[in-house]
Amino acid sequence: MSLIDWFAARRKDQFVGKVSQDTEESDGLWVKCSECGQVAYRKDLISNFNVCSNCSHHNRINSDERINIIADKDSFKEFDDSLSPTDPLKFKDRRSYSDRIKESQEGTGLKDGVITGICSINSMPLALAVMDFRFMGGSMGSVVGEKITRIIEKATIENYPIVIVCASGGARMQEGMLSLMQMAKISGALKKHRAKNLLYMPLLTHPTTGGVTASFAMLGDLILAEPKALIGFAGRRVIEQTLREKLPDNFQTAEYLLEHGFVDVIVNRKELKSTLTSILKIHGVKDLMGAN
């Protein structure tokens, strides 16, 4: 390496943010892909939906970014944005649950780990729930469960299709049984939605695990997933220790689940809106003006 090349490399390193799978943790002008190592200009990465242009790795994005990808501009109307979790069990491990809630709220600007509302997608109505992994690992507590249940009930009344973007570590242990009962509550609401022959599509993103996978994430009429998303119930290590055998390298990935029939289609983030639009049209969803 020449002296000029060495200085150029050093200068470039000064502008490369922290290497992380979550680009939100990087504050530099440049971001290094955690999958292939390609360095990209942060602004270009964002304009490409936070998908690496070299290897198509899907970086984690927040709930607002998800909504902007799916919903028509300025069409999203949020519901139940005032609901906030409490600490009924006075749970404490190394820290109190109340402190963890406060930290997550201050760090994300969210009240809890999901945003719900009604929007349009290419002029067709859609009920939308988007989980946010930044808030306590996207864990499902009583507020998350209540907000998702309410938006499903709203969709059932209004005869709207619904999409739930899943990103979760599972049930929120700090709420105990109050968290676990959300699995049944949401599933019951979805059954009523299905009884009216309305369309429900979950989008499984990285990661979707635990009680979310064991309930509404797998109840869709069509189950969509992002490429290489981690999808499962228990962790890989737990399963290997239980079965006492080595699992395939691609076990619990979207591709593995597609091959084995648990996922219907893997959708690149850049094609998500057009894919959802096509599915809605095939299922006869009319636009807001009444046309097909």
Curated annotation (Swiss-Prot):
Gene3D superfamilies reported in the protein's UniProt record: 2-enoyl-CoA Hydratase, Chain A, domain 1
Presence of the UniProt keyword Thylakoid in the record: no
GO CC annotation: acetyl-CoA carboxylase complex
Cofactor(s) needed by this chain: Zn(2+)
Subcellular location: Cytoplasm
Oligomer status and interactors: Acetyl-CoA carboxylase is a heterohexamer composed of biotin carboxyl carrier protein (AccB), biotin carboxylase (AccC) and two subunits each of ACCase subunit alpha (AccA) and ACCase subunit beta (AccD).
HAMAP family: AcetylCoA_CT_beta
Similarity comment text for this entry: Belongs to the AccD/PCCB family.
Protein name: Acetyl-coenzyme A carboxylase carboxyl transferase subunit beta
Organism this protein belongs to: Prochlorococcus marinus (strain MIT 9515)
